[in-house]
Amino acid sequence: MLVDDSYENLTLHAKGSQFIRTPALGETYVPYFTFSVPMIGGVPPAIAIRCESRDMGMHIVHSVISGNNYVVTVLWQPNIPNGDDGILYWYAFYPTSKTSRGTGVVVLRNRHTNIVTFDSDLKYLRVVDVISGSSETTANYPAGRTYASMAMRIQYRVQTDNVYLEHVDAWRWSADWDIISARWTGSTLNIRNVSMRQADQGIPNGVGGVWQQVGFSFLVVDVTGY
């Protein structure tokens, strides 16, 4: 089956990239950054990302609608001080506009409605694989193509705690994170665990705990030429 006109195909709406430099040992850095995508009709897009780095993990941790924009926050963790720099590429996909006009060399229409269901000029969301599991893994795809991953389910575990610091009469809050992330080296997808620790001082006492979700699922998307 090549085309099913019962479904609305997704096509590329916007894209962008950001270079991330591995900080020096002891250098202060912010472990997250954001990018913004203009929305169509107030509906958030489907986001695929490609992190080109052997050892730097990047993954979407938060997204929010702000006006007519979809603002996405990406968490990243370098291997300090000798890790590779990283580049994050992001791709935003929306349903194809229904039209009877096609401009590509190959155009398929529903013969009853005259609506275009495929146009070779459009950059469709091309899903080539689904990677699911609960532990680190590696997958290889044909060379000469460019791939990105789209998270459908994220595996994570976060444990929080509060400790009273008597010498400063304050509480220290901490959180230990483990998140499964996807990173690319050429056409090889590496699913790896990323561990991070957050801490702050002066937060009032609260109840610590553990929150987790077991199991991940990523779509592998061919974005060659996009």
What does each model-found stretch correspond to?
Residues 1-36, 77-163, 167-168, 195-226:
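Extracellular receptor-binding modules and their adjoining Ser/Thr/Gly/Asp/Asn-rich linkers
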Residues 34-70, 100-101, 156-182:
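Extended intrinsically disordered, low-complexity coil regions enriched in Ser, Thr, Gly, Ala
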Residues 173-201, 208:
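Charged, low-complexity intrinsically disordered segments and flexible loops
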